[in-house]
A protein has these predicted regions:
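Positively charged n-region of N-terminal signal peptides that target proteins for export
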Residues: 1-4
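Bacterial N-terminal signal peptides
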Residues: 7-15
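A short, compositionally biased domain-edge/stem linker segment
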Residues: 15-21
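Extracytoplasmic assembly/pore-lining segments of large envelope/extracellular complexes
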Residues: 21-160, 176-229
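Solvent-exposed, glycine/polar-rich loop segments of beta-barrel outer-membrane systems
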Residues: 160-172
Length: 229
């Protein structure tokens, strides 16, 4: 009888510890990965019998290890349930958007022409940004996640007007940006990657973009806010 009582007491103690652990405050860590692969490779992946998120992520990582794909960006952000959070790793690119004609049009002979004066500027954030809003489903390991991952790249500078002044090249150039972004809400099993979007990067030259695909994977983990030790 005594061993039985001891076993029951031990079981109750373990259950109490588990219940106490469940009642501890929790954080949610969100990991977003952008993985660039070839379009035919994506077609082959989606044609398989197992197209679950973890399986597709394993296949994408295998391509990365074989140099057939590359991880373009990884963003990790932790917050409490039902709280919004954001991160940004950016560089501000300031560029002119409006020009005024030169103040004088009656130029003396042989004087170099005057370039239009810069009148207005804009600032564009170039880099990676992430916004998240996770919540826990009570009594389960399911996580409802709203998130907005975004990558902005400066692709090139296009020349709008060629001009040379007394100091050298003073041509007017405008930046061309490329933005990869999605905005969605999904329900995830904690600790498992899920494929939430496929983005088509644009080529530098006009024409259909059919060679590359950008896979967006997301994973959310439940973390205790207070250490158990």
């Amino acid at each position: 009888m005594r061993p039985l009582i001891i076993a029951l007491a031990a079981g109750l103690a373990v259950a109490a510890l588990a219940a106490a652990a469940d009642e501890r405050p929790k954080n949610i860590r969100v990991c977003v990965q952008f993985i660039e692969i070839a379009h035919p490779a994506l077609t082959e992946m989606l044609a398989g019998t197992d197209i679950s998120g973890p399986r597709l992520h394993d296949q994408a990582l295998a391509l990365v290890k074989n140099a057939a794909a590359k991880v373009l960006e990884t963003c990790v952000l932790t917050t409490r349930p039902n709280q919004k959070a954001s991160l940004a790793s950016i560089r501000e690119v300031i560029y002119p958007t409006e020009y005024e004609p030169p103040g004088s049009v009656n130029l003396p002979p042989r004087q170099p022409s005057i370039r239009p004066e810069l009148d207005a500027f804009e600032t564009r954030n170039v880099g990676s940004m992430l916004e998240i809003e996770p919540s826990l489903q009570e009594g389960s390991r399911l996580i409802d996640l709203g998130f907005v991952p975004e990558i902005v790249q400066l692709v090139r500078l296009d020349t709008w007007m060629e001009h040379t002044d007394r100091w050298g090249d003073a041509s007017i150039r405008r930046p061309v940006f490329e933005k990869s972004c999605l905005n969605t809400r999904v329900t995830l099993m904690a600790g498992q990657f899920e494929l939430v979007g496929v983005i088509t990067p644009k080529p530098n030259t006009p024409g259909p973009a059919t060679t590359r695909k950008l896979l967006v994977f997301v994973r959310a983990d439940i973390l205790p806010a207070v250490s158990s030790t």
